[in-house]
Swiss-Prot record:
Residues with site note (Transition state stabilizer): 325
GO MF: magnesium ion binding; monooxygenase activity; ribulose-bisphosphate carboxylase activity
Name used for this protein in its record: Ribulose bisphosphate carboxylase large chain
Record keywords: Calvin cycle, Carbon dioxide fixation, Chloroplast, Disulfide bond, Lyase, Magnesium, Metal-binding, Methylation, Monooxygenase, Oxidoreductase, Photorespiration, Photosynthesis, Plastid
Tagged with keyword Amino-acid biosynthesis: no
Record organism: Lupinus microcarpus (Chick lupine)
GO BP field: photorespiration; reductive pentose-phosphate cycle
Organism placement in taxonomy: Eukaryota, Viridiplantae, Streptophyta, Embryophyta, Tracheophyta
Modified residues (N6-carboxylysine): 192
Function: RuBisCO catalyzes two reactions: the carboxylation of D-ribulose 1,5-bisphosphate, the primary event in carbon dioxide fixation, as well as the oxidative fragmentation of the pentose substrate in the photorespiration process. Both reactions occur simultaneously and in competition at the same active site.
Additional record remark: The basic functional RuBisCO is composed of a large chain homodimer in a 'head-to-tail' conformation. In form I RuBisCO this homodimer is arranged in a barrel-like tetramer with the small subunits forming a tetrameric 'cap' on each end of the 'barrel'.
EC number annotated for this UniProt entry: 4.1.1.39
Residues annotated for substrate binding in this entry: 114, 164, 168, 286, 318, 370
A GO-annotated cellular component: chloroplast
Amino acid sequence: SVGFKAGVKDYKLTYYTPDNQTKDTDILAAFRVTPQPGVPPEEAGAAVAAESSTGTWTTVWTDGLTSLDRYKGRCYHIEPVAGEENQFIAYVAYPLDLFEEGSVTNMFTSIVGNVFGFKALRALRLEDLRIPNAYVKTFQGPPHGIQVERDKLNKYGRPLLGCTIKPKLGLSAKNYGRAVYECLRGGLDFTKDDENVNSQPFMRWRDRFLFCAEALYKAQAETGEIKGHYLNATAGTCEEMIKRAVFARELGVPIVMHDYITGGFTANTSLAHYCRDNGLLLHIHRAMHAVIDRQKNHGMHFRVLAKALRLSGGDHIHSGTVVGKLEGEREITLGFVDLLRDDFVEKDRSRGIYFTQDWVSLPGVLPVASGGIHVWHMPALTEIFGDDSVLQFGGGTLGHPWGNAPGAVANRVALEACVQARNEGRDLASEGNQIIREASKWSPELAAACEVWKE
């Protein structure tokens, strides 16, 4: 017959291929699908595969001008979620040719761009992505990575310490720089701009950059250690963001910062390239992540956003604490912490890792634990996160009854005590409080901190 068969047909006839072998070059996705009542899971899974690749709602004449078999996404496996009725994990494979090289933006536009408002689905959540080696290799990744950062800072064998300067809005640049200096002088490695400190009427970015640079040079001279302050370069336009990064480089500071979700992946990748070319470290804040990842059955899991960041580029990223004020289940958090740091991560469903991921030597990202943590948490944090991490105590430094510098001293003493105890073979989980108590005998600053935050 001439022409083609017009009309609407079930997605599952074309896009559900349970016997399909996935290719090493495919991007694999695991979706948590909650179909509308009466919609079979195969149809729901196939609908996701279709709408995020080559499909549209009806057969079109131009389908005949391309090879659907070559380009279509395929739903290749569906399994029910234990303990949930009418919830399924649908696995979808996308041919690599559907994606632009080196563009996290395009990857997300394709995979999660359109399908989340789909009528046949009550809810949809992207749980994990397997990025194939061939695609990983089209990204620069983190500007420097864990090892290069340690070499630049000359700090080895322990987690790094940070502190977010509070109150986050309202300080003048001069007083802001003063707070930075006190913290760094006391023994922290880094201080941090809050995510919403950009360039507001009470403190313009240039003034802040200048006073913070002065503070860290002064602290460096006093302590003989390299210091950094995450200068937030996030701005309303990409051009302005790069302008701020250029100014930071001209001041000779070691690190800048970006809010990668509100700033966008395109801006973030540009900044990451600039940072590698100019020797700046890049600290990443995940402001707005909970809008996307908080719901258990809809949106995107943070591990996907973390993987995307490693491709786009960043040297540090906030990743929850496991112990402080923000929620995070321990095993799941450790799962994506490994995805950020390690070169090769095995599939492990108990840790939320749906696919084995090989990063083919893309540099690692340091996870940043931050939010409601203080000196009593130090043993647990040292044990959970290990050496390759940044521990950030905002209120846990600035809330010290004697001020910022003593607060910084308390944190540094607690950290060094925990690292030493661990290296001597002591068990941080069971002896943690004991270790902190012993250390506080020799440090009045730590003793005062222990008193304020005792549980």
